Amino acid sequence: LLKFRGFPVSSVIFHWFSGTSNEFVRARNAGCYFSVNERMLATKRGREYARQIPLDRLLLETDAPAEPNTETSVQSLIRSLARTSMHIASLKNCDAKRIESVVLANAHSVFDLR
């Protein structure tokens, strides 16, 4: 649909992707970005998708909280992002600091942050 409408697919961000495996592969192969949060990593399918997201297409979700009636302070968001980075790092067999630096670079690229 996005290609049909003329949108640049490489600027699409899938927020907490929960589609089928085939849809995931199509979106990944098209160069879409994927944002990940702790709740996504709580499921087997979510962890598998996170493992397969290319590092240059990975973002972390910052629209906390993922659950209603949970703490929404800046500190709780920072802790959640750190846990998410560590979990993704373990899935990808790399250091959490690498995940954090890649995500920061991706955010700068996607959102044209200077």
Identify the residue ranges that each predicted region occupies:
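Compositionally biased amphipathic helical and low-complexity segments enriched in hydrophobic
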Residues: 2-3, 56, 105, 114
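Active-site micro-motifs of SAM-dependent methyltransferase domains
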Residues: 34, 66, 109
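Hydrophobic faces of well-ordered beta-strands that scaffold small-molecule active sites
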Residues: 12-15, 34-36, 58-62
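Divalent metal-binding pocket/active-site signature
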Residues: 1-30, 40-53, 67-79, 93-97, ...
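Conserved short-loop catalytic and cofactor-binding motifs
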Residues: 34-37, 72, 87
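Mid-to-C-terminal alpha-helical segments outside catalytic/metal-binding sites
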Residues: 78-114
